[in-house]
């Protein structure tokens, strides 16, 4: 867990992890919403 060169900044791996998790979560919510909305008629 060496943050050499990232003093005073957020580590890039942390930004990538948070952004990736948020993106996957949002996509999951959208897919789940469309699945529930359309799944009732299928």
From Swiss-Prot:
Designated name of the protein: Photosystem II reaction center protein J
Subcellular location: Plastid, Chloroplast thylakoid membrane
Organism: Pleurastrum terricola
Pfam family, any one: PsbJ
SUPFAM superfamilies found in the cross-reference section: Photosystem II reaction center protein J, PsbJ
Entry GO CC: chloroplast thylakoid membrane; photosystem II reaction center
Keyword annotations from UniProtKB, A to Z: Chloroplast, Membrane, Photosynthesis, Photosystem II, Plastid, Reaction center, Thylakoid, Transmembrane, Transmembrane helix
Membrane topology note: Single-pass membrane protein
Function summary: One of the components of the core complex of photosystem II (PSII). PSII is a light-driven water:plastoquinone oxidoreductase that uses light energy to abstract electrons from H(2)O, generating O(2) and a proton gradient subsequently used for ATP formation. It consists of a core antenna complex that captures photons, and an electron transfer chain that converts photonic excitation into a charge separation.
Family of the protein in this entry: Belongs to the PsbJ family.
Subunit annotation: PSII is composed of 1 copy each of membrane proteins PsbA, PsbB, PsbC, PsbD, PsbE, PsbF, PsbH, PsbI, PsbJ, PsbK, PsbL, PsbM, PsbT, PsbX, PsbY, PsbZ, Psb30/Ycf12, at least 3 peripheral proteins of the oxygen-evolving complex and a large number of cofactors. It forms dimeric complexes.
BP terms from Gene Ontology: photosynthesis
NCBIfam families: PRK02565.1
Highest taxon of the lineage: Eukaryota
Parts of the chain that traverse the membrane: 10-30
Predominant location category: plastid
């Amino acid at each position: 867990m060496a943050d050499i060169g990232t003093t005073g900044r957020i580590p890039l791996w942390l930004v990538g992890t948070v952004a990736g998790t948020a993106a996957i979560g949002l996509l999951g919510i959208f897919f789940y919403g469309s699945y529930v909305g359309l799944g009732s008629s299928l």
